[in-house]
Amino acid sequence: MRLSFLSVAIRASLAVGISHIFTSQVLADVATNSEDAPETTLDTLVIRSDAYRTTATKTALDPEKTPMSYSRIEQETLQQRQADSVASALRYEPGVSSESRGTVGIFDEYTLRGFKNYSNFYDGMRLPYDGTWNLMPQVDAYATEAVEVLKGPASSLYGYNEPGGMVNQIAKTPKNTPENEIRLRAGTNNLKEIAIDSTGPINDTTNYRMVALAREKDGQMQTTEEKRVLLNPSIEYKPSNNISVLANLYYQDDPHQVPSTPLPSVGTVYKASYGKLDADAYAGDKWNDFSKKVFMPSETINWKINDLLTFKHTLRYTDADAQQKNTYHQGFSEGSDSKLIRTAYTTDEKMTNWATDNQLAYNLITDNTSHNLLLGVDYQKTDSTAKYADAMYNGIPIIDLSDPDYDLFSKTALSLTGYQQTDDIEQSQFGVYLQDEMQWNKLTVVAGLRHDDYKSTTKTTATGSDTKTTVNEANQTSGRLSALYQLDNRFAPYVSYAQSFQPVLGVNYITGEAFKPTTANQVEVGIKYSSADKATKATLSAYDITRKNDKVTAIDWTKQTQTGETTSKGFEISADHRFNDWLNVGVGYGYVDAEITKDEFHPEYVGKMPQQVAKHKASLWAGITPNNKTILNLGVRYQSGMQINQANSDTLPSVTLVDVSGSYQISPTLTAGLNVSNLFDKTYVGSCYDRNNCWMGAERQASVSLTAKF
């Protein structure tokens, strides 16, 4: 029952959160005044520890001096934009197509500079994904201090990755000043949420933080629901200014989430005999469901050995599992444009992962030149099992989209024995990287090189066939060379060359050999600007990416070879300006010209744009502060239509959406908030993979909140 679930979750979260809040208040009273940080008033207060390192370089290099496209979305912005996920956090990021499946929240999916990306990072280390089904650990936006976006290839620091870039979520960490927050939120789709964030000192050397959340709401699609509970305690021990030890635990339980159940293009993109479907249309059944649990403890050591030498070590363990019950369809029954022929399937996935990253940094200064040398060694090992069972259309009832009945499945008679497959996968990666960050007068040069040894062993047992073992390996060296020069007028042009690779699982149908990794390279030029008073910041970048060794279909999806190539050329503009004390405006635009440049088996696809990529994306975000108690925000985002299929036989309509948010400080400790995304409730199709698989865009979501800070 929904109420019983929320009741238990709220009580658990309150018990943990209030106990920590109470503890922090008592201990803060006995803490020495010398531990209290000085109070500073800024437009947006951003506190970063001495150990902070950016995603772009794994160093503390100022973003204005970083010779590549890099941005950071702070927690305050995430809350203003009602972001509960990475995908929603990227709505206003140029060059990024996010929420292409707006009704689905089981994984964070987006394209960066024209390339699909499923691999997210958490505190600088990859969240594991074995490349099979849907078990992808997620970190809720409320437990995230910031989201950092690095565009372009990043394999010289992070190993295998898609060439469009990477997204890194920065965890909330303990602070040495008491801060406590309780937030209540309610909204459309029966949204109910309580969130707690408490931090402060335990004693002179130890700080804690506890982040907890319980959320439930109805899913956008009919009869679906979403529930989440997370606990994220952390503790930092700092016996001196030279060493700190951080222990972090992230636990998330999603007992109910909305699976990815596609709709046909008829009724969504195209008008059917009964008209068009609403945004909450669903081709599934009440039987459909998705659940996931993630348990991630980690520890980080930062050690300042001396003024020139520092060491950072991180170790993380992940234990995750996911169960799915879902349907897909084979098109309409003969003579109908509303009755879908469906089948049912289940997936049962389990995964464990060990990951470590170790960095030694040495600051060498010679005459007018400084070298920040970084030597790193990282390793990760993933063991996973994915079980798949499919009814193969045996006894699965048809659904009539014009008059849907979502309670057609007989759970006792449902047979999933038409086809079954089990994949046992072992993956490992060992990487060594070296980077020199050189600064000479106004010139910054970043040069990096990394070598990776990757291996994946997959044992597949399927109905009607013997067990098959496939071994995919990648021994790859990736590099990056970038330079930026700061002019006297505060403009800073830069140029960058970077490489990436991505392992490909499976066997080449023609050669019988294991697939090789895809490889990519990018050339990027750009210019940055930052005014002396920091009121204006802007970045203009242009890029050219080529990826080789793409998989292409030889006969059908089970028989593939590796002779494809994809290129993506484009440019991005982002600018923020604070006009005065009460008006801030940010604008962004991204142009992506991605196309398939090689496909020997399907020459008709050459020159076509990949699916789920928007060629144009533009946005505007304005923040208004009429007084010291009121904040108003208005956002407008435009996205051009994506292609309906690989052949580009049609283009989806473009869409313009409006978001608003605001807050009012009722008292020094109490603030009321309002957030509305898709203000005018625009019904649109988020994306299609082909004419049989389309997903609606996110409908209007509104919420009110009450936040107590003390």
Give short role names for the model-derived ranges:
Residues 297-320, 342-460:
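Face-selective signature of the C-terminal outer-membrane beta-barrel domain
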